[in-house]
Amino acid sequence: MKRLKRAAAALMAMAMVVGMASCGGFGKKDEQKTETVKTADGKEVEVKVFSAFFAVPGNKVDDGNVVQNKIAEKIGAKCEMEWLTGQTAEEAIGVMIAGDEYPDFVDASSGMKSMVDAGAFIAIDDYWDDYPNIKNFYTDAEWNSIRAEDGHVYIIPQFGKTWEKDTTCVHNDEAFWIQTRVLKWANYPKIETLDEYFDLIERYIEANPKMPDGTPNIGYEILCDDWRYFCLENAPFFLDGYPNDGCCIVDRETHQAIDYNTTDTAKRYFKKLNEEYKKGIVDPETFTMKYDAYISKLSTGRVCGMVDQHWDFNDAELAIKANGKLDDCTYVPVGITIDKGVEEHWHTNPALDVSNGIGITKSCKDIEGAMQFMNDLLDPEILTLRNWGIEGVNYNKDENGIFTRTDEMRNNANDQTYINKNLCPYAYFPNYSNGMDHDGKNGCDANHQATEFYESLNDEIKECFDAYGVKTYVEMLNEAPENEAWYPMWSYSNALTTETDEGMVWTEMATVKHEYLPQVCIAEDFDAAWDKYLSEYKKRCDVDGTLLPAFNKEIQRRIDVAAGK
C-alpha cells in the first residue's frame, strides 16, 4: 500500500511539472513566454510570463487577477504560480530533479538542499550588481550567512524582512489559541498555565456541547500531518518559557543546547493531552487527520482551541470571518506556561531563516528578466500594490497620506474568493513583510497599521481586546526581547540531511516521535506508554552524543559571527 501511495504521489508530482511546462517558463526552447494584458484604460500591453513552483500548499490567483495585471502593466512581467498539492515537498522536488527540468522560480521548502546539491539554481550573486533592490535586500553580513558552501548565493529568503521598524499587529507565529466565545463565556479570565487553559475549555464544552446549528463543539485539535506535527510535539519548550528555536532549548547562560523532548515539562504536557483525550476534549480523529481536513474542521467554527502557527491556519480564519455568522469563533493567542511564575516568550522579533528561500532555476530562459522581475517587485510603488492593493479600490488615502479602508474594503480583504480574483501579494517572492511602507507614514500592510488594524476587527474581537486592555494580537503576549545571536536554531535543523550523522539522528527523531507520540496521547496507561516512547527514543536517537554537540557547535559559531570573530 505504501508503494502504491508513493507511486501515486510521484505521478501527481509529474503531472504538476508537466502542467507547468505547458503554461510557464519551460515551454519551447529558447523562447520566453509572453501574453497580452489589458490596462485599466483598455489598452493592451505585452508582458513576459514567468513560472514558479512553491513546495507548500497555497491559493492560486485567478486568471485576469486585477492587481497582478496592474503590476504586470507597470513592470512588464507577471508570474504564474503553482503550489504543492497531493504530495510532499520532497516528492515534488525529487521529480523535478529526476527530470532535470524546472519552472523559472522555485521555493523547494524542505527539498531546498536537494535542489542546491543538484545544481538546479543559478548563482544570484553573479547577476545582482545590476539589480540594486535585490542586492540591497540584505546586508553583506546577512548575505554571507545565506551563502552556500561554495560561496555563492542561490536563494533569497523571502520572509521576516523589516523596513525601518517592526509594527506588526498580528502574532503570526505559534501559540495556544482559543476562541473569543470561550473567553467571553468565562468573563475574560486571565489564563497563565496549561492546566488553566484546558480547565476553561472543559467547562465551556460541558456548558456548551453544541453549536447553535446543533453540531457538536470540539474542545481541542492537534495537527500531526507530515512536517506540521510541530503542533503536537514542540510546545514543551514554550511552556518552559523559551522562544521558538524549534529544534532545541538553548540555555541563556551556558549557551548549551538542551533536548526539550525529554524534560519533566514534556512529560507533564503529554500527560495532560492524554487526560484530555480520555475526557473527550481532544478530537478522536485528530491524530489521523490530514492538513486539508484540519483546516476544514477549524473553518466550521466548532474547534475551541489548538496549538499552531497563525500562518498555518490563516485560511481557516479567513473562512470563519467570511461566514458572517461565526464572529465569536475567531482565535486569540494566550501566553501560557507550565506553571505560574514562568516568563513566557511566545512572540519573537522577525528573524532571518537562511535554510530556505526562492531561487531562479537553470531552466529559466531569461535569467536577467527573472532578476528584473524580482527587483521590480521590491520597488516602493509595487510593494504598496502587493501589500495594500489599488488606491481607491482596496484602500483610501487621507489628506495626510494615511491609508484607511472602508468596511467593504476590509471585508473584501478577508474573502478568499475576492482575494483570488483581485489581490496579488506575490507572497513567496521577496517582500518587506514587516514594518513600514516605504512612504514612512503607513504600515507595510493593514496588519502593520495599528489604527486601521483595530478598526478592521469585528465587534467580538474588539470586545475581547478591550477586556484585556490591548489593541492587537501581539499585545496579548509578552513583548519580544532582542533575538539572541543563535536565534533561530530551526534555520540550522531545517537544513540537516541524512548525509551527516547529526542529520541521521534528526531524521530518526522525527520518525520516532511521529510513531510514538500519538500513541502516548491515547494510551490507557500513560506512564507505560511514555516509558516505552523514551526507551525507543534513546535507543534509536543518539541525541546526547551526536545531535546536541552539533547544535552546540552551531550555537557557538553564530555567537562568534555576531561578535565579528
Please provide the spans of the model-predicted regions.
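Loop/turn elements at helix/coil->beta-strand transitions in domains of secreted/extracellular proteins
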Residues: E44-F50, I75-C79, G99-D104, A118-I122, ...
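Ligand-binding "clamshell"
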Residues: S114-Y127, H152, A316-E344
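Conserved N-terminal structural module of periplasmic/extracytoplasmic solute-binding proteins
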Residues: R6-A9, C23-E196, Y242-I249, Q256-D259, ...
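Conserved small-residue motifs centered on glycine
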Residues: T384-E515, E524
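Helix-loop-helix "hinge/cap" segment bordering the ligand-binding cleft or interdomain interface
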Residues: H152, P157-F230, D251-K297, R302, ...
